């Protein structure tokens, strides 16, 4: 049987050719290969480096003196003690089934020991992302269980012996690591249970292990007004010198992976050398011109991630999330549409921009998503459907509801089926428990989250039903 995931990946990869041609033709006129090759390389360099721009998310999160809900100094956890509202802008398409505890680890000086509590069976997962957005380790219910434990995270060049009470050593290929933890919380009623568990997450420098370590307070930092701007908006506003200059700086501490050799050769030909500063005014003029032209890739990438292969309007995220290899297109696409997405075996993310007739969602219309009794998402934990505006943020509404989750008091039909009403106005008091408020106008998109999904989700034998427009 043909693997649908392979079809998805092939389709996304093939779009790089269309993408590059679109950039080349955008300026009009005919190009020779000599003229077009730098641009061909420039677009690929842009796509290759795009996930590394998650460094802007790091900047936003760590430019604070003390740990809070949405930010913390380096090597400390920011603990989300309650679900955010529609004003949240730090990360796109964030979920509302799990409370996050997130840290940015700097492994430049020494390894860190990550300590987790006994969650008494409560579901949690901590994904360790390198700066290329690959997940090099996953800690939690599925992989390591829910008992307390200590795990060491070491940088690529560390040599030494871990403490005897460390369960496992995870080696990061990059200096910086995004420690992205989430723990199931069924709304405010669970906060009193989950918050104390979250606050037991801890990162301890190896040199302080065995001591009574307290993370530093009131850490000095340099205020940066740009951190108030959503990271994707900051990227879209960059010029070529800033974008590729930042990439060159990041490559000093976060080396390309061994399989990236051909891409590194392309970067070198463009004048972007690993470990060296980059100044666009000092490179070959044809390369500089190509890199400036390549910046339009952002807007084309934005469109490309919305046209993944779908069934009944739903696109299933590629199966290589978190383990991309040289699949740079998928890697950039996921960084664009859902930075922080974990591996499908932990969470599956069907996404819909269109209804069952493949028409874009419109806030002026009304929709119904119906699950037959035997069609409910198969999961070992929890599932939900969330709604977002075109930029990937919550849709403000009168009841402050941004998702419908299986733990909520949803009303099922007599035959066991479930209807969700997706529209701007209330469907009526008797149906309001199943109402997912949409914007009054304009487009929106939906993300289903299936935590620890059944194998039928992973092999696509189970699929989401289409969202039908109400006539």
Tell me the role of every PLM-derived stretch:
Residues 14-471:
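A compositional/structural signature for long, glycine/proline-rich flexible linkers
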């Amino acid at each position: 049987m043909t693997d649908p995931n392979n079809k998805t990946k092939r389709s996304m990869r093939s779009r790089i050719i269309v993408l590059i041609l679109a950039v080349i033709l955008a300026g009009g006129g005919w190009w020779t290969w000599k003229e077009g090759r730098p641009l061909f390389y420039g677009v690929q360099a842009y796509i290759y480096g795009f996930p590394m721009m998650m460094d802007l998310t790091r900047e936003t999160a760590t430019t604070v003196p003390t740990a809070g809900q949405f930010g913390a100094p380096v090597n400390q956890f920011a603990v989300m003690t309650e679900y955010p509202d529609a004003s949240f802008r730090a990360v796109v398409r964030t979920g509302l089934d799990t409370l996050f505890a997130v840290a940015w680890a700097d492994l430049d000086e020494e390894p860190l020991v990550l300590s987790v509590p006994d969650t008494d069976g409560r579901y949690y997962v901590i994904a360790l992302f390198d700066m290329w957005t690959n997940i090099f380790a996953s800690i939690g219910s599925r992989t390591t269980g829910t008992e307390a434990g200590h795990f060491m995270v070491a940088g690529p060049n560390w040599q030494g012996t871990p403490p005897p009470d460390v369960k496992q050593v995870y080696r990061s290929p990059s200096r910086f690591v995004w420690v992205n933890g989430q723990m199931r919380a069924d709304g405010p009623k669970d906060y009193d249970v989950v918050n104390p568990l979250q606050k037991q997450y801890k990162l301890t420098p190896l040199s302080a292990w065995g001591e009574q370590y307290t993370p530093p307070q009131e850490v000095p930092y340099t205020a940066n007004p740009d951190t108030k701007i959503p990271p994707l908006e900051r990227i879209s506003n960059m010029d070529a010198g800033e974008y590729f200059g930042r990439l060159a700086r990041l490559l000093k501490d976060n080396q390309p992976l061994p399989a990236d050799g051909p891409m590194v050769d392309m970067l070198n030909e463009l004048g972007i050398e690993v470990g060296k500063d980059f100044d666009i005014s000092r490179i070959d003029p044809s390369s500089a011109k190509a890199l400036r032209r390549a910046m339009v890739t952002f807007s084309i990438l934005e469109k490309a991630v919305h046209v993944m292969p779908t069934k009944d309007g739903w696109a299933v995220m590629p199966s290589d999330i978190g383990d991309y290899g040289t699949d740079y297109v998928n890697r950039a696409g996921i960084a664009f549409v859902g930075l922080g997405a974990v591996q499908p075996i932990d969470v599956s993310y069907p996404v819909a921009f269109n209804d069952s007739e493949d028409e874009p969602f419109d806030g002026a219309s009304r929709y119904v998503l119906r699950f037959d009794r035997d069609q409910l998402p198969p999961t070992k934990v929890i599932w939900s459907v969330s709604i977002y505006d075109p930029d990937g943020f919550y849709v403000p509404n009168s009841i402050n509801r941004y998702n419908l989750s299986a733990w909520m008091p949803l009303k099922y039909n007599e035959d066991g089926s479930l209807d969700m009403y997706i529209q701007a106005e209330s469907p009526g008091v008797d149906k309001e428990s199943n109402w997912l408020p949409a914007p009054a106008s304009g487009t929106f998109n939906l993300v289903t989250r299936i935590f620890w999904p059944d194998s039928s989700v992973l092999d696509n034998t189970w699929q989401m039903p289409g969202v039908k427009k109400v006539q």
